């Protein structure tokens, strides 16, 4: 596997920045609690399907207290179009109760505390810290796990390994948005089956590993 040198890495992020100066996540949310819920719901589901369900849900429950009052059964009625909704509903009710009991109904700005909540893993915690609190974490999803090694930004084979590589090689000035740049690039350009190399802003920089 070929990897980019530091000059090449910087050029990659310069191009991604030029193409999309202010990348945005595609999940809809209103506060850090609704962000946490939306990210939890997005596991093995599309952002579009989550947004469709949460548009109505967040009108009636956008705080831990309101979600707990809604209850698991009624929550299921809002999210039943989302994959694994019974398990996700159970976890959302449980984490709402824990947020009230342990964190004064506030979403904690701490990775360890976030990962102690029901259903919240390392990737979810990183997304919430980045999008909700402006911390330059890099959450590695399936798109980033595929795309970062293709480009030559990482030789990792697991999400944690790719995350470690990206935190090392990504220039500080690009770290805040690195997650979204690579994710969106993988979702819309460097796709799994038919990467759109001829249309790619990185075509002259990319290592094209495993393509």
UniProtKB/Swiss-Prot annotation:
Residues 111-130 form the HhH domain. Binds 1 [4Fe-4S] cluster. One of its GO terms (molecular function) is class I DNA-(apurinic or apyrimidinic site) endonuclease activity. DNA repair enzyme that has both DNA N-glycosylase activity and AP-lyase activity. The DNA N-glycosylase activity releases various damaged pyrimidines from DNA by cleaving the N-glycosidic bond, leaving an AP (apurinic/apyrimidinic) site. The AP-lyase activity cleaves the phosphodiester bond 3' to the AP site by a beta-elimination, leaving a 3'-terminal unsaturated sugar and a product with a terminal 5'-phosphate. SUPFAM superfamilies: DNA-glycosylase. [4Fe-4S] cluster binds at residues 190, 197, 200, 206. PROSITE patterns: ENDONUCLEASE_III_1, ENDONUCLEASE_III_2. It catalyses: 2'-deoxyribonucleotide-(2'-deoxyribose 5'-phosphate)-2'-deoxyribonucleotide-DNA = a 3'-end 2'-deoxyribonucleotide-(2,3-dehydro-2,3-deoxyribose 5'-phosphate)-DNA + a 5'-end 5'-phospho-2'-deoxyribonucleoside-DNA + H(+). GO terms for biological process: base-excision repair, AP site formation. Its EC number is 4.2.99.18. PANTHER family: A/G-SPECIFIC ADENINE GLYCOSYLASE/ENDONUCLEASE III, ENDONUCLEASE III. Keywords: 4Fe-4S, DNA damage, DNA repair, DNA-binding, Glycosidase, Hydrolase, Iron, Iron-sulfur, Lyase, Metal-binding. This is Endonuclease III. Belongs to the Nth/MutY family.
